A protein has these predicted regions:
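ATP-binding/phosphotransfer module of carbohydrate and carboxylate kinases, centering on a glycine-rich
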Residues: 1-69, 75-79, 84-118, 125-143, ...
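Short secondary-structure boundary segments
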Residues: 157, 221, 306-307
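Short, active-site-adjacent cap segments at secondary-structure transitions
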Residues: 160-163, 201-204, 226-227, 236, ...
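Short, acidic, Ser/Thr-enriched surface-loop or helix-capping motifs
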Residues: 108, 163, 230
Length: 369
């Protein structure tokens, strides 16, 4: 937040939205960090009455989510009591189930990863084995804070999938997952609420929460290639969570066969160039796809991530930036677009999975259909 709330964010004094108002207050406490924020500032920022803010903060303190953080001088009156969030009052688990590895994080209310585990994973193994690895990771992370509540588990996996029902569709290279109810199956194993989304959407959520970015595309190149889109400040999933299947856009009609059954997909061309050791070509291909997105969506920024990008960040940034600049020089737009790399390698995916659980706590549930 940056000082004022949009109409959708502003507090509304109706009983039916008490949770919404509490979420607004919690989000401002989170944003204030260790310095804290006064009740008067909370009322000014949310549009709620001072009385409503006092009731909400009293409840948050009783629940252990907020504590006093000292006094702050005021002009002409008595010092104001400052409140701050208690980050370790509650946690969320984030899981990134990749094609060949599992990353799991325990994230506190401030968004900090307090425990991280990684392990090999064969996403092509029987579902029971994959579920066992995922539930074991959740158990191990909960042991790091055994006496603190875990709100739920966010799971980020390759698409396509239906995030509303938590059901996987025909993941490229892994057709056995088609129709599998991952959300319900893992909830049954862990006893916790589970939210499922695409890995690229989870990473895009992490980027969008870390800094104001405007409209951007997050391009994840690892063992596969996909995109997460943030438009109007919200993760854009599409009507059926189909947005962002970027890797299987056709770039060369007579190109090499892709695992999806098509030819000349951006993913196939990128990974083939990497396999040949031609990283400059891989970056150029990724840049061509990125430039298409820039022209189609008029976005402000392209953010790159994934282990393949992390192996040579400079090469990928240069290559993608060069293609976008070349298109812009021909009048195709994109002169304003910046290209950057997401921090943390593959970690933003797992951390974004945890944010799928935490974001609603703070009223940050942006989603486009």
């Amino acid at each position: 937040m940056n000082g004022s709330l949009t109409k959708a964010q502003a507090g509304v004094g109706l009983p039916a939205v008490r949770h919404h108002n509490a979420a607004l207050v919690l989000d401002l406490l989170r944003e204030a960090g260790t310095e804290g924020i006064s009740r008067l500032e909370l009322a000014e920022r949310t549009g709620l009455t001072p009385q409503a803010v006092s009731k909400i903060t009293a409840r948050l303190r009783a629940e252990g989510l907020a504590v006093g953080a000292g006094l702050r001088p005021s002009t002409g009156g008595k010092p104001r009591t400052v409140l701050r969030l208690v980050p370790d009052a509650q946690f969320a688990v984030g899981l990134h189930l990749d094609r060949d590895g599992l990353t799991a994080v325990l994230v506190d209310l401030a968004g900090r990863s307090v425990a991280v585990t990684t392990a090999p994973l064969d996403f092509g193994a029987p579902a029971e084995r994959v579920l066992g690895a995922a539930s074991d990771a959740v158990r191990d992370l909960r042991a790091a804070e055994p006496h603190k509540p875990v709100l739920g588990v966010g799971v980020a996996v390759p698409g396509p999938l239906d995030h509303r029902d938590g059901v996987l569709h025909r993941v490229t290279g892994f057709p056995q997952w088609d129709g599998f109810p991952l959300r319900d199956a893992l909830a049954g194993r862990t006893g916790l609420p589970v939210t499922v989304d695409k890995d690229t959407n989870a990473a895009a959520l992490t980027v969008s929460l870390s800094e104001p970015c405007g409209d951007f595309a997050y391009l994840h190149l690892g063992t596969g290639l996909g995109a997460g889109l943030v438009l109007g400040g919200e993760v854009h999933r599409g009507a059926r969570t189909g947005a962002g299947e970027f890797g299987h856009q056709t770039l060369q009609l007579d190109g090499p066969l892709c695992e999806c059954g098509g030819r000349g997909c951006i993913e196939a061309l990128c990974l083939a160039a990497e396999a040949r050791g031609d990283r400059a070509e891989a970056a150029r291909v990724l840049g061509a796809g990125a430039a298409n997105l820039v022209g189609l969506l008029d976005i402000d920024r392209v953010v790159l991530g994934g282990r393949t990008v992390a192996a040579d960040e400079d090469a990928y940034v240069r290559g993608v930036r060069a293609v976008i600049a070349e298109r812009a020089a021909r009048g195709a737009g994109g002169a304003h677009v910046t290209v950057a790399v997401a921090d943390g390698g593959d970690r933003p995916v797992a951390e974004g999975a945890a944010q799928l659980v935490l974001a609603p706590v703070f009223g940050r549930v942006g989603e486009r259909g």
